[in-house]
């Protein structure tokens, strides 16, 4: 998704049922440190995000504000990095450029080679204005469906989803899979 001016956040905040909006920016990069490299994505969130936070394996939230680049312990190991080291991030969107970023912290997550940064600091490091590529919304309970329909009709919206709907769908799929497996195991048991 091409990033755009963050002014769209104000338009989203005015939609009915929206109680809070946080901007995000995802930037595809190749990290380089010495002879090691790894393709990844820098996930730029509001420094003091509430709706979408970086949470470690022990369920502790990490504040991004003033931290520089925050990477997972697995990405740090793969690149041979420690806190305080500087790596090169080759940006793979927009105009070609490379930026040196200092690792401010590592976070232990269950999976992934992830990298995070305060969105405003990320934009400054890239020499960009106030850009965003996505938004996280808090919505009044029970009004999600109407809002999703309204959002899908907006220009430049690539997709919209509800966490509650996704969770409900996953639960339905899991329940169906349990029923199928129970039926199969019952058939096997009756044959034996």
Give a label for each model feature:
Residues 78-82, 126-129, 173:
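A short glycine-leucine-enriched loop at secondary-structure breakpoints
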Residues 175-192:
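Hydrophobic alpha-helical transmembrane segments of multi-pass inner-membrane transport and secretion
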Residues 25, 61-122:
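Hydrophobic secondary-structure segments that place a key small or acidic residue at a functional site
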Residues 158-180:
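Juxtamembrane "pre-transmembrane" interface segments
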Residues 53, 63-64, 106-155, 159, ...:
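Small-residue transmembrane helix packing/gating motifs
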Residues 15-19, 81, 93-98, 154-158:
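Secondary-structure transition/capping motifs at alpha-helix termini
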Residues 22-25, 88, 136, 159-161:
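Residues embedded in well-ordered beta-strands within globular domains across many folds
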Residues 1-66, 70-74, 82-85, 169, ...:
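Juxtamembrane segments of multi-pass membrane proteins
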């Amino acid at each position: 998704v091409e990033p755009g001016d963050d002014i769209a956040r104000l338009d989203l905040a005015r939609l009915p049922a929206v109680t809070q909006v946080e901007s995000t920016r995802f930037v595809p990069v190749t990290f380089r440190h010495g002879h090691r490299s790894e393709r990844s994505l820098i996930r730029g969130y509001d420094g003091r995000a509430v709706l979408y936070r970086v949470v470690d394996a022990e369920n502790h939230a990490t504040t991004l504000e003033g931290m520089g680049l925050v990477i997972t312990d697995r990405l740090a190991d793969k690149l041979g990095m420690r806190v305080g080291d500087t790596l090169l991030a080759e940006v793979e969107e927009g105009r070609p450029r490379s930026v040196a970023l200092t690792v401010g912290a590592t976070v232990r997550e269950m999976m992934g080679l992830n990298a995070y940064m305060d969105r405003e600091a990320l934009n400054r490091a890239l020499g960009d204005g106030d850009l965003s590529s996505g938004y996280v919304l808090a919505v009044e309970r029970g009004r999600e469906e109407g809002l999703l329909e309204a959002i899908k009709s907006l220009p430049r919206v690539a997709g919209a989803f509800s966490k509650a709907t996704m969770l409900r769908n996953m639960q339905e799929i899991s329940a169906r899979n349990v029923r199928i497996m129970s039926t199969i195991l019952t058939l096997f048991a009756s044959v034996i």
